[in-house]
């Protein structure tokens, strides 16, 4: 599975895959796209490099050709990924460091957002914050969100077994205590809301930029509301002052 790391969603679901073909001799040709011409080059490089790794690992693929279209840094990114050069070499003189730290930051945010997705149903079902602080991952009802959280924690080397605490610090892996739990849950919620808002905005902008839905795109109704709000030119109603 190839993810748009900043949004923690598959690039297919986001609509970022413009086309994908595999020749009879095992050459996979994938064209990627982004919502704007000026999307951050570090994010774009991560996406293309991760796509190269994911496609190359598919059984039967002899060679992967991953191309980012319509981006101001397309040439540098495409040539760098094809040559297996890193970000610094691909942007010689412009980049100071590789993207490992950035990737880890994105995954930590995904852990926080995933924590909210797992904990909200538990709280809605009557669990208390004290309950959450004492729970393990294995005690959470099985769900796609739980396994997604487990996967992100594993990527960072954080505790992720059934016996691991449900709530851990996304940097240190230490269990979150009862006193720190309210703040931790607020941060998790804000991170999840921010990620979903960014995802909706990206989908809306991509839809405005390209007519086709993309290979494997999944429609998100939230993006419709966000896009309508951004494009709404109706002036806000004037404030009515009341006088005694």
Language-model features and meaning:
Residues 1-37, 42-244:
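Domain-level signature for proteins that mediate thiol-based redox and metal-cofactor handling
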